[in-house]
Amino acid sequence: MDRIENAQMNSLGTRKLYYENVHQTDFTAVVMECVPDKEEGYYRIVLDASAFFPEEGGQSADKGTLNGQEVLDVSIKQGILYHKTACEFPVGTRITGHVDWNRRFDFMQQHSGEHMISGLLHSHFGLENVGFHLSDREVTLDMNGEVSLEQLRLIEQEANAYVWKNLPVNISWPTAEELASLNYRSKLALTENVRIVEIPGVDLCACCAPHVDTTGQIGLIKVVNVQSHRGGVRINILCGNRALADYTEKQDSVWAISSLLSAKQPEVAGAVARAKEDARLQKERANALQAELLKVQMNALPSPEKVRHVLLFVGELDAIALRNAVNTLTGKYSGYCGIFAGDDTNGYRFIVGSASCNCQELADRMRRELSAKGGGSAPMIQGNVAVTADTLQTMWASL
């Protein structure tokens, strides 16, 4: 491992440019260490200074490049930043770094929005944030108590009202004495080098991550999901451009549904409910007709004196009706009684029963010869198979 000894870096860690200027995306720095990871085939680069925020505080690391080479990850240990790259950089050389600003700003919007929601839940309901995760795909915050959807909607409305006020987001590094006098949110008991993020009247929290300059830069805060989680709730939020993209996607869906169902946009939920109920009734009627057709087919079967095994094909029919029909047949015929629901194109659901034959033996054969899926017991088996009706009739003829 190559290394340049640097007393200041060893005592204070890498100079963190994102704390000096959160908007800085381009920088130059000297390579202090180049640590090969032989197992992974990567290198971990230590610089004297870096604008890359690492994976820390529940947030994924910044993305970007060093000398045009992709930075795959950034981690921090004892204040030193390690940049994971596929390329080796000689120790002592000066290199150029670039941070993906669009992604940085996106994460700033999400994290500042999370502070506002968590801070308001804390001040209104005494809830503590006990978990936080921010990645490219989601923002989740875990609270240690229950909150109703109605309460959450009020919190969301209040948070956005503070966004519109364009409040400053203040960053400070209070002394130990100053820290002792502050009533701030924190998951850990901290005593020194504590970075405080303040949104006046909304939140006061210890945090290591980059934040927006003012609440107006967040743009929009939207709660998109809430569910019970470990005695509390897990809340999913989207802020800024993510919230806009989510709204656009959902608006496109509403437009499409509105057109398909010939309903006004505010009325699509009711239109979908009616369409669902209509489909249920249609399915019930279709099942009733299929059940009647099945009875006709069963009555048309040869007598038990002429055949031992019987096989029937029907359209879509619910499992209860299929099972009842098979039970009726097994009370009449001594061999395998099979009913297959479906068609040659989409495959068949089946139930096979017998009062005297071992249906598990038939299931084994169907798996071997027809790649059928399913199982059951000696009196009855059920499953799925993707073959033609002719193939099944050939098998039944061989029983």
Can you name each region flagged by the protein language model?
Residues M1-L399:
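A glycine- and charged-residue-rich anion-binding loop/surface
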